[in-house]
Amino acid sequence: MRELVKLVCTECGDENYHTTKNKKTTPDRLEMSKYCPRTRKYTLHREKK
């Protein structure tokens, strides 16, 4: 079953994005390079615990 997760910017701490993930196939935390509107650049976004 897919679960909704929030992605948090590692530089400013904002929750800019949300996505779904399958916990059976990807048990570890997601890390994606996404655009952060506050810092106005692409930064690493990690899954919020």
UniProtKB/Swiss-Prot annotation:
GO terms for cellular component: cytoplasm; ribonucleoprotein complex; ribosome. It comes from the Bacteria. The keyword Disulfide bond does not apply. GO terms for molecular function: structural constituent of ribosome. The keyword Hydrolase does not apply. Keywords: Ribonucleoprotein, Ribosomal protein. One of its GO terms (biological process) is translation. InterPro entries: Ribosomal_bL33, Ribosomal_bL33_CS, Ribosomal_bL33_sf, Ribosomal_zn-bd. NCBIfam families: PRK00504.1 (NF001764), PRK00595.1 (NF001860), rpmG_bact (TIGR01023). Belongs to the bacterial ribosomal protein bL33 family. This is Large ribosomal subunit protein bL33B. It comes from Acholeplasma laidlawii (strain PG-8A).
